[in-house]
A protein has these predicted regions:
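Catalytic metal-binding core of the metallo-beta-lactamase
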Residues: 1-173
Length: 175
């Protein structure tokens, strides 16, 4: 996946914010998506993505499957966050996931550095007690990271829990 243009991230941020706010009012997710779709800029690709999300949601009941299939538009990390919220065995709430996605999209609109992106995503894993292995695998696929970063992230994924995060961060200096 390549990085999207700024306007796409701005619209994604609005989309996730609107979903979060309207779900709090107990509106059905498909209905909310249909209404929000009409509010999104038609010059972006998000309305098409919303159509696909709605179709997959009505077919399988899961939004994360569509996000994974739309890997050219949504990052693996975004799909992972939604999949974690959809996991019936987990404790991660969809409303929290939508907040995470909103902040992620708004953050990406500012063209953040790889360091900032990593720490935002890693903090999301830690604060919400999400699966480190699956989460770091998703982070590895982020278009923000180049080959050196991917090598370091692979190392982190293998060593997390065995080595303190501070030592892993210090190892980054040598890349």
């Amino acid at each position: 996946m390549e990085k999207l243009i700024r306007e796409e991230y701005v619209e994604q941020g609005y989309f996730f914010k609107a979903l979060r706010e309207r779900l709090a009012r107990s509106e059905a997710l498909q209905d909310v998506m249909e209404n929000v779709r009409e509010e999104i800029l038609s010059t972006t690709k998000l309305p098409l993505a919303i159509d696909y999300l709605r179709a997959e949601l009505s077919h399988s009941g899961m939004m994360s499957l569509a996000m994974k299939k739309l890997s050219h538009y949504f990052t693996a990390f975004q799909a992972f966050v939604v999949a974690s919220a959809e996991d019936e065995k987990g404790r991660f709430d969809l409303r929290v996931a939508l907040d995470v996605l909103r902040f992620d999209a708004e953050f990406r609109a500012t063209d953040p550095t790889p360091v900032a992106t990593f720490f935002y995503q890693f903090e999301t894993l830690c604060r919400n007690r999400l699966d480190y292995d699956k989460g770091l695998s998703a982070i590895l696929e982020d278009p923000t990271f180049d080959e050196g970063w991917r090598n370091w992230l692979t190392f982190v994924r293998q060593q997390i829990g065995l080595i303190e995060l501070t030592d892993l961060v210090l190892s980054l200096i040598h890349i």
